[in-house]
Amino acid sequence: MTNASLDDLDRAILKLLKKDARLTIAEISNQLKKPESTVHFRIKKLQERGIIEKYTIIVGEPIKPRKLALVVLEIDMPIIEDFLERYIEYVTKTLSGFSEVLFVAKSGKEKIVALVGGESEESLLKFIEDNIESIPTLRNVMVFPISEIKKGDEIAGFLAEV
């Protein structure tokens, strides 16, 4: 779905709900100075079109990780190339099982990218060393500690496991 299929009212509704999904239809209609029936209809259509998939929460400071690192894993090409895809699937499932691993994605043919969180830089690096760098047949593990988030600070709170 592209932004072109959204008009200004749809975008305004989405912006408000993104900021606070607890808003009632009455509150949204008051803020946008539109009838409640219009807002209700638009939200229903946004849901039917799959633009609004679900309503969720972003956990706050007491729960979300204090330190983050982006980790890029390069997988060694196995002798039998057909095993690469299965091994990457195994590694991504293994990483996904850790609560410290907030996000896992495949990048290209031989790389996996993960966002990892921890309470302190020391615990974060120890987790990476003990649980990620120890995975067999990795050619390289690059760790990029995140010192400051410029946009998307809520992502860790959204991804954090409870």
From Swiss-Prot:
Which keywords has UniProt assigned to this entry? DNA-binding, Transcription, Transcription regulation
* Top-level taxon of origin: Archaea
Gene3D superfamilies (UniProt xref): 3.30.70.920, Winged helix-like DNA-binding domain superfamily/Winged helix DNA-binding domain (1.10.10.10)
Residues in HTH asnC-type domain copies: 6-71
**Where's DNA bound on this chain?**
25-44
A GO MF term: sequence-specific DNA binding
Pfam families given for it? AsnC_trans_reg_3, HTH_24
Task: Supply the SMART domains for this chain.
Answer: HTH_ASNC (SM00344)
For this protein, the record's PANTHER family field holds:
HTH-TYPE TRANSCRIPTIONAL REGULATOR PTR2, TRANSCRIPTIONAL REGULATOR, ASNC FAMILY
Q: What protein name does the entry list? A: Uncharacterized HTH-type transcriptional regulator PYRAB09690
